[in-house]
């Protein structure tokens, strides 16, 4: 969610998501640059299918006037949404992890979960009668979410806008998530590699160079700003013919 700035300059921003009873608090500061990027206050960590209470404080600047503001918002966040495959073991959309024990040292942690749903009629459009496949052989839908140490989902990725099960170039298993130094995430799937921030803002979404196919598992950021991708060669020269190579 974004709490819009209404055209005012706002600084010294602090956000707190009021936790559920016995829940985990999420609180953070927002830089002036991020406030400009989003046109307001980015709100992260809302409980899904729940009316959240969000407390914000900031300095409102209008000319020479500076005003310290504290506000509280009630924001409903929609339910978690992942692909429904028809599999017998899929009974709901939530991840429902069972928390066994939380060490006090780790109780404020958040965990990014990257899970794959098995292929189904919807998520396996390019694997009919072909036992070899490539990255698309494992083309089930993705379950990407961030959970807290109480087992609650605090963020999830709706993949529909970027993942098209009916397109060879826009489907495949989402793998290789890595948080970069700027906070944004890089990952890849099928014939693509991407970078988005946690609020869903696209930084880039690119097709693999045409000499390569079938991204899987690893997209690593280098110190110099380049990226290493695990892919296959689109055409490897053999004695009498060319053939796609295995990944690596």
Positions of predicted regions on the chain:
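Conserved small/polar residues in nucleotide/adenosyl-binding loops
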Residues: 241-248
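Blade-loop segments of beta-propeller domains
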Residues: 153-220
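Beta-propeller domains
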Residues: 119-164, 193-197
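Short beta-strand elements that form the blades of beta-propeller/WD-repeat-like
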Residues: 109-114, 134-137, 183-188, 226-231
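Aromatic (tryptophan-biased) beta-strands that constitute blades/sheets of beta-rich domains
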Residues: 54, 71, 75-106, 111-113, ...
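Structural signature of eukaryotic scaffold interfaces centered on beta-propeller domains
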Residues: 92-105, 173-181, 220-223
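Short beta-strand segments enriched for Tyr within beta-sheet-rich domains
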Residues: 46, 50-58
């Amino acid at each position: 969610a974004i709490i819009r700035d209404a055209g005012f300059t706002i600084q010294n921003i602090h956000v707190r998501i009021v936790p559920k009873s016995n829940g985990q608090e999420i609180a953070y500061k927002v830089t002036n640059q991020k406030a400009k990027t989003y046109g307001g206050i980015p709100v992260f960590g809302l409980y899904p299918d729940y009316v959240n209470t969000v407390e914000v404080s900031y300095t409102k600047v209008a000319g020479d006037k500076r005003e310290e503001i504290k506000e509280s918002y009630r924001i409903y966040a929609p339910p978690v949404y992942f692909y429904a495959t028809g599999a017998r073991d899929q009974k709901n959309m939530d991840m429902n992890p069972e928390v066994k024990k939380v060490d006090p040292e780790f109780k404020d942690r958040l965990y990014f979960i990257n899970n794959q749903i098995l292929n189904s009629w919807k998520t396996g459009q390019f694997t009919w009668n072909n036992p070899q496949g490539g990255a698309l052989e494992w083309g089930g839908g993705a379950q990407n979410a961030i959970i807290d140490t109480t087992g609650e989902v605090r963020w999830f990725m709706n993949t529909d806008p970027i993942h098209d099960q009916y397109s060879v170039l826009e489907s495949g298993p989402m793998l290789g998530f890595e948080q970069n130094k700027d906070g944004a995430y890089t990952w890849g799937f099928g014939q693509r590699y991407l970078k988005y921030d946690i609020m869903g803002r696209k930084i880039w979404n690119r097709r693999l160079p045409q000499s390569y196919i079938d991204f899987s598992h690893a997209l690593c950021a280098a110190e110099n700003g380049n990226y290493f991708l695990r892919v296959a060669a689109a055409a490897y020269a053999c004695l009498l013919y060319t053939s796609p190579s295995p990944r690596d």
